[in-house]
Curated annotation (Swiss-Prot):
Effect of residue 16 to A: Abolishes interaction with XRCC5/Ku80 and XRCC6/Ku70 and ability to inhibit classical non-homologous end joining (NHEJ). Does not affect interaction with SF3B1
N-acetylmethionine modifications at: 1
Polar residues bias: start-end ranges: 123-136
A biological process from GO: double-strand break repair via nonhomologous end joining
CC per GO annotation: cytoplasm; DNA repair complex; nucleus; site of double-strand break
Molecular function GO terms recorded: damaged DNA binding
Gene that this sequence comes from: CYREN
Renumbered residue ranges of the record's region Disordered: 77-147
Record's keyword terms, sorted: Acetylation, Chromosome, Cytoplasm, DNA damage, DNA repair, Nucleus
Name assigned to this protein: Cell cycle regulator of non-homologous end joining
Keyword Nucleus: yes
Protein species of origin: Homo sapiens (Human)
Domain of life of the native organism: Eukaryota
Biased amino acid composition, Low complexity: 98-107
Length: 157
């Protein structure tokens, strides 16, 4: 009988007391907080990558692209120079090679490098005075010019 009385006592509770219990059961506050807290770190983790992308303007992108291209060209030249210095055969060491990165529109540079390939035994200081302007400049200047040409083609055409 006592169990019946306890059941009846729960049914006899005042409405304000049952409403409070019903509120706790119907809308638990812990579940939404957990979801919100889980969503905040995910959003915070995404922010740095997004900010990095949006902070770069066109000038910065061009600077980074130039830096990468120049660095890769320097590495290529560094790998080629020891091989060229060790080679005694003139056919293995062309004095002024045309880089694979030059555009097809520079036919005069290709013709000039062909003229210098005719005299492979001469060092750069022994070449005739009428050598091309592409080889009279330093290799770094030529690399920068090629890189700038590509950047202009990509971003400004």
């Amino acid at each position: 009988m006592e169990t019946l009385q306890s059941e009846t006592k729960t049914r006899v509770l005042p409405s304000w007391l049952t409403a409070q219990v019903a509120t706790k059961n119907v809308a638990p506050m812990k579940a939404p907080k957990r979801m919100r807290m889980a969503a905040v770190p995910v959003a915070a983790a995404r922010l740095p990558a997004t900010r990095t992308v949006y902070c770069m303007n066109e000038a910065e992108i061009v600077d980074v692209a130039l830096g990468i291209l120049i660095e890769s060209r320097k590495q290529e030249k560094a790998c080629e120079q020891p091989a060229l210095a060790g080679a005694d055969n003139p056919e293995h060491s062309p004095p002024c090679s045309v880089s694979p990165h030059t555009s097809s529109g520079s036919s005069s540079e290709e013709e000039d490098s062909g003229k210098q390939a005719l005299a492979p035994g001469l060092s750069p200081s022994q070449r005739p005075g009428g050598s091309s302007s592409a080889c009279s400049r330093s290799p770094e200047e030529e690399e920068e010019e090629d890189v700038l040409k590509y950047v202009r083609e990509i971003f400004f055409s």
